[in-house]
């Protein structure tokens, strides 16, 4: 499963580099109802705790969290579009908690000419997200170690087949994807 402590620390490290030297930095965590879990709540709490401890004199962080009801098609796209159209509500830093939100935010940054006005930390990686990181439209992304998930899944299946149950909790690591390492996440023919 997702290690909320490590993931929270990874997000905090990325957000810390985006804080204004003086004054308030607004940071919004954006997730969808399909991606919102207990783990994402724990990640948010971890980031809040760490940012509070790390901020320097004169810095403050306005941390908010919003969960888009994604029960109908295009709900996420509509919410993100509305957020960018009413740009007085735009945060300084937008933290995307899933791949769909990340890709919607990327498209909205371009469509509404907000590239550079909002710093974005994405989640996971797709060709679209990797291209956005290479173009410096998205600052970075946090991704789970998919190889490790595969190995742990096989281990749990082996344990289940041999013992009739599996009761281990497998904590999966994550990686921070930046412009410097996007090539590591592309398939061989894309490099």
Language model features with spans:
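Hinge/cleft segment of the Venus flytrap/periplasmic-binding protein
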Residues: 145-191
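Short beta-strand segments enriched in small/hydrophobic residues
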Residues: 25-38
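Short, solvent-exposed amphipathic alpha-helices that sit
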Residues: 7-11, 38-61, 75, 79, ...
């Amino acid at each position: 499963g997702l290690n909320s402590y490590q993931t929270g620390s990874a997000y905090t490290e990325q957000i810390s580099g985006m804080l204004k030297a003086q004054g308030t930095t607004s940071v919004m965590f954006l997730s969808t109802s399909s991606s919102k879990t207990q783990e994402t709540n724990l990640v948010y709490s971890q980031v809040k705790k760490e940012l509070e401890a790390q901020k320097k004199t004169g810095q403050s962080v306005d941390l908010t969290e919003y969960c888009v009801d994604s029960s109908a098609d295009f709900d996420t796209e509509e919410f993100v579009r509305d957020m960018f159209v009413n740009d007085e509500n735009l945060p300084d830093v937008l933290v995307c908690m899933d791949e769909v939100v990340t890709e919607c935010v990327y498209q909205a940054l371009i469509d509404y000419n907000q590239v550079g006005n909002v710093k974005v930390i994405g989640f996971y990686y797709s060709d679209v997200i990797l291209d956005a990181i290479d173009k410096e439209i998205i600052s970075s992304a946090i991704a789970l170690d998919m190889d490790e998930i595969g190995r742990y899944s096989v281990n749990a299946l082996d344990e289940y087949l041999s013992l009739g149950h599996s009761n281990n909790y497998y904590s999966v690591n994550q990686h921070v994807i930046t412009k410097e390492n996007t090539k590591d996440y592309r398939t061989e023919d894309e490099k």
